[in-house]
């Protein structure tokens, strides 16, 4: 298959992966309305073409948390990367490192912190969930610090897991799930050889190091399901702020008031995110939520954004809507599943080229010059208008 655009990796990954894995990464919560709107709303943001601007000295470089980035992109924390390619977290981290951008290791990674961190030169970021077992959280933070992780990404939009109906149909969960997964694996030989046989151990490395090695995937799912904490509040985060002395980013912000609370709390950054449409279906897409949040806290805190970003044009759109940097999730996972480290490296090259074209044709020589002026104003203002209170006479 010819890979000429980032979108080509999705089709390639679907051919290679057993259905339970493809649909686990590709699916969302409930009817997947927000999952679809993430992509569609962002694609409808119109760029403003400008010409004859002498763009010969264009630069994508930026700085975030005192780290130099080759472009305003980081790889998002994505669970189970090691089930999509052999030791997948290591391969993705190496690709990000070679491109000069951060890699974020998920709490629920297959490869543990101690395996991934030594494989790259720049410090990686680490993502942590709020869990009832504070002992695990402290253990994970201590290990992340010992491994030299520079930035903590704290995911707060998962006090309880979202209902992902696709998983029951695909075999990730539901009746006879283990047998269905086995049958799918043996009928996908490329994956079975690369990951099924040669990518072991298939456990959640950061958790097994704390609990010991559970007997199967269901044991991890059960432990995690029992440990998500719906009682969490800002007060519960204070001990983490005291314990972690590096940059701390709050992931899962969709409301301007929550963004202001993050500033008051003392966070260094936020991620405008709906968890890729995997938590609460029907919430705003990140593209629609971002402008109002930027209006509220831009300049007071670093603003990152994810959900729906599939190519370099989308990166430019998110920056113009108010983000300082974006996180890539599904986009890099499709590439990882298709061709491992080389796939992610090629994806990042494609995104960089697409960004350069978009910046050249919108007249933005640097990341700081990508602003609302880079957008067609009537359309770029539309997402923020979605947050305005509905007039009583227009209620439906």
Curated annotation (Swiss-Prot):
Known catalytic reactions: (S)-lactate + A = pyruvate + AH2
UniProt GO molecular function: FMN binding; L-lactate dehydrogenase activity
PROSITE patterns noted in UniProt: FMN_HYDROXY_ACID_DH_1, FMN_HYDROXY_ACID_DH_2
HAMAP family: L_lact_dehydr
UniProt organism field: Escherichia coli (strain SMS-3-5 / SECEC)
Parts of the chain that traverse the membrane: none
NCBIfam families reported in the protein's UniProt record: L_lactate_LldD, PRK11197.1
Subcellular locations according to the entry: Cell inner membrane
Residue positions binding FMN: 106, 127, 155, 251, 306-330
Protein EC: 1.1.-.-
Family of this protein: Belongs to the FMN-dependent alpha-hydroxy acid dehydrogenase family.
Keywords recorded for this protein, A-Z: Cell inner membrane, Cell membrane, Flavoprotein, FMN, Membrane, Oxidoreductase
Binding site for substrate: 24, 129, 164, 278
GO cellular component, one term: plasma membrane
Main location: membrane
UniProt keyword annotation of Cell inner membrane present: yes
Span of domain FMN hydroxy acid dehydrogenase: 1-380
Protein purpose: Catalyzes the conversion of L-lactate to pyruvate. Is coupled to the respiratory chain.
Active site: 275
Membrane topology according to the record: Peripheral membrane protein
GO aspect biological process, one term: aerobic respiration
Cofactor(s) listed in the protein's UniProt record: FMN
Name assigned to this protein: L-lactate dehydrogenase
């Amino acid at each position: 298959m010819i890979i000429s655009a980032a979108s080509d990796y999705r089709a390639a990954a679907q051919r290679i992966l057993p259905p339970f894995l493809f649909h686990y990464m590709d699916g969302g919560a409930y009817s997947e309305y927000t999952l679809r709107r993430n992509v569609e709303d962002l694609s409808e943001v119109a760029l403003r073409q400008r010409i004859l601007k002498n763009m010969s000295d264009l630069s994508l470089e930026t700085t975030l948390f005192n780290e130099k980035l080759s472009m305003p992109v980081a790889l998002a924390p994505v669970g189970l990367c090691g089930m999509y390619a052999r030791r997948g977290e290591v391969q993705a981290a190496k690709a990000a490192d070679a491109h000069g951008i951060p890699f974020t290791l998920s709490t629920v990674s297959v490869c543990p912190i101690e395996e991934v961190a030594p494989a790259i030169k720049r410090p990686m970021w680490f993502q942590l969930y709020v869990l009832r077992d504070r002992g695990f959280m402290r253990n994970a933070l201590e290990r992340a610090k010992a491994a030299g992780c520079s930035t903590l990404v704290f995911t707060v939009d998962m006090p309880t897991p979202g209902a992902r109906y696709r998983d029951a149909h695909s075999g990730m969960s539901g009746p006879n799930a283990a047998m269905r997964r086995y049958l799918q694996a043996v009928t996908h030989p490329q994956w079975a050889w690369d990951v099924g046989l040669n990518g072991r151990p298939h456990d959640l490395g950061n958790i097994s190091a704390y609990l010991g090695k559970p007997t199967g995937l269901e044991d991890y799912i059960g432990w995690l399901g029992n440990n998500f904490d719906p009682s969490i509040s800002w007060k519960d985060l204070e001990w983490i702020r005291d314990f972690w002395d590096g940059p701390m980013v709050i992931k899962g912000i969709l409301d301007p008031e929550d963004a202001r609370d993050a500033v008051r709390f003392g966070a260094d950054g936020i991620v405008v995110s709906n968890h890729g449409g995997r938590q609460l279906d029907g919430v705003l897409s990140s593209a629609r939520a971002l402008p109002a949040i930027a209006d509220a806290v831009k300049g007071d805190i670093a603003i990152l954004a994810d959900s729906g970003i599939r190519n370099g044009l989308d990166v430019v759109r998110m920056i113009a809507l108010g983000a300082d940097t974006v996180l890539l999730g599904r986009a890099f996972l499709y590439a990882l599943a298709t061709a491992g480290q080389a796939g992610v490296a090629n994806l990042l090259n494609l995104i960089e080229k697409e960004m350069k074209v978009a910046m050249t044709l919108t007249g933005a020589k640097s990341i700081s010059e990508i602003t609302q002026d880079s957008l067609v104003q009537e359309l770029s203002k539309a997402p923020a208008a979605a947050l305005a209170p509905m007039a009583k006479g227009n209620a439906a």
